[in-house]
């Protein structure tokens, strides 16, 4: 019979259109976790979502003339194991760019 030690885990999912801003945010989060003696795993790259929009170029007749636009949503996953109260406080005070969407699960 094995005894499992209950580990506390924080899972952080990040989404952004700009990959560089996303990577900088991941680096800040991991650096903050390392300074507070928590174990950070990641950033784990998740699949990039591509959304393509097809738009008619002319306002009237020419349906053959179309233009395509796309948005790419880059995603990353970070797991923080054994966070202390200092870790959570430091993550709450962290200043991240406005173009990065963050989901936190305990």
From Swiss-Prot:
SUPFAM superfamilies: Ribosomal protein S10 (SSF54999)
Gene Ontology annotations of biological process type: translation
Gene Ontology MF term list: structural constituent of ribosome; tRNA binding
GO CC, any one term: ribonucleoprotein complex
Gene3D superfamilies: Ribosomal protein S10 domain
Subunit details: Part of the 30S ribosomal subunit.
Protein name: Small ribosomal subunit protein uS10
Gene: rpsJ
């Amino acid at each position: 019979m094995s005894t499992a030690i209950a580990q506390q885990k924080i899972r952080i999912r990040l989404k952004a259109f700009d990959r560089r801003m996303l990577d900088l945010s991941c680096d800040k989060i991991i650096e903050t976790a390392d300074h507070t003696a928590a174990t950070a795993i990641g950033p784990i790259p998740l699949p990039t979502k591509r959304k393509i929009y097809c738009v008619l170029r002319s306002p009237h007749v020419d349906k053959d003339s179309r233009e395509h636009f796309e948005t790419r949503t880059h995603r990353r996953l970070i797991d923080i194991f054994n966070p202390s109260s200092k870790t959570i406080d430091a993550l709450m005070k962290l200043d991240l760019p406005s173009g990065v969407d963050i989901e936190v699960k305990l």
